[in-house]
């Protein structure tokens, strides 16, 4: 492969880190993956070790390049995509985090959001950020870190108030993209898509919002510079004396769901995709208009290229989909994710069983932080096959909840939906989704479109690809699933909504 050049993408996800290398045709030429530990200090709390994530990032880059016989000099650029909202704060001098990263799934700041609601401030937050105020986003996580991190972890002679150090500019806040850009280039930068998920960023003015910073007591000195998702000026370059041994431009970054939108070439208003990962996230490009939702969806930044207007998106965030399959493994109902398809096919129906996987509350369009996982309709005749099938159906039903809200807000009927993510390898799920949505499901040949989107953003910035049309030509269909065999879909969907109602407000304090 000597002489050829490529673009690399770091895909830092909830459960692990991947590095992929793509050629001009958008084909994968190298790929490596490493899991990291999920840390659960208390019920409802989820943390990651940011140093472990950085170590794994270096490992997968080395492993991918080695496996394909590539040198770092053959990379024209690196793009980054990441689990969004996950939040950390680190010491600028030592580069060490002051606490584990607080993961997007973490619910420790639920009470803070309820205080915001009680004070009547949610409408203002929603108007500025496009987000439904929730512990999911970064603002309350950053506030918690500044209030609760152990100052001894700063490894200074004066273990004093972290807030003082933050105000003095000695600490840095970031989502995972910022952490990786910092470690790769030494620069403190985020992109517009990740900034839009912090609940501190005004998506209309496209800047950090002073009123929100005051509300959550986050000093501006803590914050990164906000740059386009595809940046002709680059975020910086890797160090020739560092682990890569080459100066490679780091030129693109997008939150994982926006990266998938970009990788699916959803460049025009009305284009939509659904990504099935730990959670599921449906995004529809709304062009240069920030369409504010009246049906429980989020309005967010889709992407921005250098010198061009911001492209916005409507988003339906479903917290638990693929993680429900992992739960089946944890409960030893299946040995691996692939077995779920076989078991689901082995029964004609769920036999009246409905599973609402609200392990961390419910996202769009319900937004109930105190909803909890619920299985209804079981009898003595219920078998594991029924529960497995009900789990897959829950993914499709939750997606329909979001799709109906999206059609109402956008006034666009979904005639086709592009899908990606690990779960779309499951043909049963794709067909089930088509039936329940009564919509064509289109699966691309490259299903890891999140990494591809990050590569496209970086590659466009350095001229590896010149136009969006080149990227559209790269997009190839693997399989299309047309609706068939509805099996009382409307009745089943009605029963699903009843099951959701049973799950709501369960974890309330007596």
UniProtKB/Swiss-Prot annotation:
Listed CDD domains: ASKHA_NBD_FGGY_GK
One GO CC term on file: cytosol
Binding site for ATP: 14-15, 278, 322, 422
Molecular function as annotated in GO: ATP binding; glycerol kinase activity
Binding-site list for glycerol: 84-85, 136, 256-257
Entry EC no(s): 2.7.1.30
Summary of the function given for this chain in its UniProt record: Key enzyme in the regulation of glycerol uptake and metabolism. Catalyzes the phosphorylation of glycerol to yield sn-glycerol 3-phosphate. It also catalyzes the phosphorylation of dihydroxyacetone (DHA). Involved, together with the DHA kinase DhaKLM, in the metabolism of DHA.
Family statement drawn from the similarity comment of this UniProt entry: Belongs to the FGGY kinase family.
NCBIfam families xrefs: glycerol_kin, PRK00047.1
Name of the protein in its database record: Glycerol kinase
Organism encoding this protein: Haloferax volcanii (strain ATCC 29605 / DSM 3757 / JCM 8879 / NBRC 14742 / NCIMB 2012 / VKM B-1768 / DS2)
């Amino acid at each position: 492969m000597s002489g050829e050049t490529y673009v690399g993408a770091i895909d830092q996800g909830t459960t692990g880190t991947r590095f992929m290398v793509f050629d001009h045709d958008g084909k994968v030429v190298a790929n490596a993956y490493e899991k990291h530990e999920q840390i659960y200090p208390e019920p409802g709390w989820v943390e990651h070790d940011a140093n472990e994530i950085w170590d794994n990032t270096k490992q997968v880059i080395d492993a991918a390049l080695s496996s394909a016989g590539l040198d770092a000099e053959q990379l024209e650029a690196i793009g980054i995509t990441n689990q969004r909202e996950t939040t950390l704060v680190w010491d600028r001098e030592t580069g060490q985090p002051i606490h584990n990263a607080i993961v997007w799934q973490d619910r420790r700041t639920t009470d803070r959001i309820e205080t915001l609601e009680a004070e009547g401030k949610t409408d203002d937050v929603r108007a500025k950020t496009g987000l439904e105020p929730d512990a999911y986003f970064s603002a309350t996580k950053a506030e918690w870190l500044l209030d609760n991190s152990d100052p001894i972890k700063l490894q200074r002679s004066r273990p004093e108030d972290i807030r003082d150090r933050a105000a003095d500019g000695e600490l840095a806040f970031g989502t995972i993209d910022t952490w990786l850009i910092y470690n790769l280039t030494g620069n403190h930068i985020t992109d517009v898509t990740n900034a839009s998920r912090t609940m501190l960023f005004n998506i209309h003015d496209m800047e950090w919002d002073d009123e929100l910073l005051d509300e959550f007591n986050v000093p501006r000195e803590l914050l990164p510079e906000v740059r386009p998702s595809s940046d002709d000026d680059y975020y910086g370059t890797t160090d020739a004396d560092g682990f890569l041994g080459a100066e490679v431009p780091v030129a693109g970054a997008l939150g994982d769901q926006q990266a998938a939108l970009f990788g699916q070439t959803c460049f025009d208003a009305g284009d939509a995709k659904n990504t099935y990962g730990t959670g599921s996230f449906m995004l529809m490009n709304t062009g240069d208009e920030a369409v504010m939702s009246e049906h429980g969806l989020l309005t967010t930044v889709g992407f921005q290229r250098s010198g061009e207007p911001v492209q916005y998106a409507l988003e339906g965030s479903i917290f638990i989909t693929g993680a429900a399959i992992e739960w089946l493994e944890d409960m030893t109902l299946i040995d691996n994710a692939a077995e779920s398809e076989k078991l689901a096919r082995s029964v004609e129906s769920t036999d009246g069983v409905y599973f609402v996987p609200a392990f961390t509350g419910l996202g769009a369009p319900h937004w109930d932080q105190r909803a909890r996982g619920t299985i209804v309709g079981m009898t003595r005749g219920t078998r594991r096959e029924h529960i497995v099938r009900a789990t897959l159906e829950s993914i499709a039903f939750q997606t329909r909840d979001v799709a109906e809200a999206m059609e109402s807000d956008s006034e666009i009927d979904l005639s086709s939906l592009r899908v990606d993510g690990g779960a779309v390898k499951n043909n049963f799920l794709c067909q089930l989704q088509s039936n329940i949505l009564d919509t064509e499901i289109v699966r691309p040949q490259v299903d890891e479109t999140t990494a591809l989107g990050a590569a496209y953003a970086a590659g466009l910035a350095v001229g590896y690809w010149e136009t969006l049309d080149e990227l559209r030509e790269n997009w190839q269909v693997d399989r299309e699933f047309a609706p068939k065999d509805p099996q009382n879909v409307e009745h089943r969907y009605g029963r699903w909504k009843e099951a959701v109602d049973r799950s709501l407000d369960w974890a309330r304090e007596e």
